[in-house]
């Protein structure tokens, strides 16, 4: 790698997305990535191409921004090097958007403005935006608590089965835990 392309990939998280990004950087540039995360997840546990550094509650503020400020001052401070931040998950993407102005002074990364991120990451306002700009999107029905009576939907679906059931807010969904929890559920019929 030439001096002109000297950079350090800093990946946020420790899941399969992080491993995939680290592999891409390693294959393209021959460099090892650094990752910061709250927990050590299996996909990166024994990897030789990414060094995972754990910080308790790193996925939450104020720990995230306080840690990034400290890293900027104490670790990632070589003026000859570029520091590339990559959010490998919705929660970290939200944190980068929230702190975009401050972090962009020292790190390189892509992030929406926070208000736009919030608008587009919530399925209700996302589909409203699609309608506003006449953008196509899959047939959708937003189900609210008052539409469910005795555990059953009180109206007919506007489309046939199978259907995908997803949370309206993928970032908030990360903090909800129960047996059988998934990113999306495929429902084949009414029973």
Model-derived segments and their meaning:
Residues 79, 98, 106, 117, ...:
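Glycine-rich phosphate-binding/catalytic subdomain of phosphoryl-transfer
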Residues 56-60, 118, 185:
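Pocket-edge positions in alpha/beta enzyme catalytic cores
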Residues 1-112, 146-150:
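ATP-binding N-terminal substructure of ATP-dependent carboxylate-amine bond-forming enzymes
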Residues 111-121:
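A short, structured active-site edge motif that brings together acidic residues
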């Amino acid at each position: 790698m030439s001096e002109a392309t000297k950079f350090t990939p800093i990946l946020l998280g420790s899941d399969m997305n992080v491993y995939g990004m680290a592999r891409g950087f390693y294959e393209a540039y021959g460099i090892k990535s650094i990752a910061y995360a709250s927990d050590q997840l299996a996909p990166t546990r024994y990897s030789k191409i990414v060094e995972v550094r754990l910080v308790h509650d790193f996925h939450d503020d104020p720990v995230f921004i306080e840690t990034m400020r400290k890293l900027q001052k104490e670790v990632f401070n070589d003026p000859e090097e570029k520091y590339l931040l990559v959010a490998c998950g919705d929660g970290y993407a939200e944190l980068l958007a929230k702190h975009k102005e401050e972090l962009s002074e020292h790190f390189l990364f892509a992030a929406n403005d926070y208000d736009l991120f919030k608008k587009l990451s919530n399925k209700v306002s996302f589909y409203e935006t699609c309608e506003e700009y006449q953008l196509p999107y899959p047939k959708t029905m937003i189900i609210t608590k008052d539409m469910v009576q005795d555990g059953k939907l009180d109206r007919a679906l506007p489309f046939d089965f199978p259907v995908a059931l997803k949370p309206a807010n993928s970032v908030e969904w990360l903090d909800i835990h129960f047996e059988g929890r998934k990113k999306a559920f495929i429902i084949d019929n009414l029973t």
